Amino acid sequence: MAYVDGFVAAVPRANKEAYLRSARAGAKLFLEWGASRVVENWEDDVPNGKLTDFRRAVAAKEDEVIVFSWIEYPDKATREAVQKKMIESPEMGAMEMPFDMGRLIFGVFETLLDV
């Protein structure tokens, strides 16, 4: 069964190109290490909710957009191996993220349906 790392972040609108550069560099490594796919999505239409929403979940500021991303793996074992490589990687450690990592939300998911 496929595994997915999911992420939601608030990125300053002005940092779109810097974000894309860091995302490309990270994606290259994740794919080399065994990930099946890396997807990065830049906010187009993220409405405010009545109770909660993406913007509140990451305490997005007025000048920030929501980025919704995921990394797919063929199975849990591959995901765990990739995570180990990520933690040990000097390249990942040296990457500067163009957003506040403290407000990043993430989780690991088992694919339930993929049609």
PLM regions: where:
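Long, hydrophobic N-terminal alpha-helical segment
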Residues: 1-18, 25
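Short amphipathic alpha-helices in soluble, non-transmembrane regions
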Residues: 20-26, 82-90
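Short, well-ordered beta-strand segments in beta-rich or mixed alpha/beta enzyme
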Residues: 4-11, 50-86
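Generic preference for well-ordered secondary structure
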Residues: 3, 14, 22, 63-66, ...
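Generic detector of contiguous secondary-structure segments
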Residues: 18-31, 66-70
